[in-house]
Regions:
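Outer-membrane beta-barrel porins/channels
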Residues: 47, 65-270
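N-terminal, post-signal peptide beta-strand-biased segments of exported outer-membrane/organellar beta-barrel
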Residues: 1-78
Length: 270
């Protein structure tokens, strides 16, 4: 699919991006698909460049025909992933060059989803479908600021969260023949806004390098994670079942969300 999937449907491929596509699964086939991916990241701060490489199991999915015009799919997909560890150093004051700082950034873990979905074709050319997913995982992020001058306190902040909740996705596809060898498919998807019910925790430690004393602060924000309304639309042209041209557009409505740290953290500081 090469990233285009809202309007894509084939009898021998699993398209979990739009659950309406499951209705096209071949009645004599059990489909199984798995994929891996690699990622190379480049970080640049104050002229210092770092590279990071990682590989992930992208997905494991399957699909089969349950009844006439009805297909079923299930699988495990990544929702997000975090993985980095790098540091940068520089002078606190570029003119005097007496003291320097080191900032260290670390992050790991990620979120995953296990889903099951149905796709049904009530009339020729029109398919509808839905996925229900269980979303789970955790993440950790740490930012540490340290200094060569013992009079300057070092600071470490750790951010963590654990999520376990559901996610819903709905899809529609409509295919219309426009000539003897050409078809056009319109695909639509919608995912409703949903609060994942998980809390976000922050733990801060300020260390005095002279006497080793610690000053700690922590706070937790309840129901800190929400998924926005997500709407997608796509159009695909299929010529003679030999080649396809498609275009997808997805909108995530993040403007409805409050600023998490600025607006809510002060209410939970302890």
């Amino acid at each position: 699919m090469n990233g285009v999937g809202l309007d894509f449907h084939e009898h021998n491929q699993v398209n979990y991006i739009n659950p309406a596509s499951y209705s096209s699964v071949d009645s004599l086939t059990f489909l199984f698909d798995a994929g891996i991916s690699g990622q190379i990241s480049n970080f640049n701060e104050n002229g210092v460049k770092k590279n990071a490489k990682n590989a992930n199991l992208d997905y494991v999915v399957a699909a089969f025909r349950a009844f006439r015009h009805m297909g079923v799919s299930f699988g495990i997909l990544p929702f997000s992933n975090v993985g980095y560890n790098y540091s940068v150093s520089g002078w606190v004051n570029e003119e005097t060059k007496e003291d320097y700082y080191t900032n260290t950034y670390e992050g790991d873990e990620g979120f995953h989803q296990a889903y099951v979905g149905l796709g049904y074709m009530p009339v020729k050319g029109l398919s509808v479908g839905a996925n229900i997913s269980y979303l789970w995982g955790k993440y950790n992020r740490t930012v540490t600021n340290s200094y060569s001058n013992s009079y300057i306190n070092s600071l470490s902040r750790n951010y963590s969260a654990r999520v376990g909740s559901y996610k819903l996705d709905f899809g529609v596809q409509y295919t219309q023949r426009v000539s003897k060898k050409d078809w056009v498919t319109l695909g639509l998807t919608y995912s409703p806004k949903h609060n994942l019910g998980a809390s976000a925790d922050m733990y801060q430690v300020k260390t005095n390098a002279m006497d080793g004393s610690l000053d700690t602060t922590s706070f937790s924000i309840d129901k800190a994670f929400e998924l926005p309304h997500m709407v997608g639309a796509g159009l695909m042209w299929n010529h003679a079942a030999q080649w396809k041209v498609g275009l997808d557009y997805t909108l995530q409505m993040w403007e409805d969300f409050e600023k998490l740290v600025n607006d809510r953290s002060e209410e939970h500081t302890s």
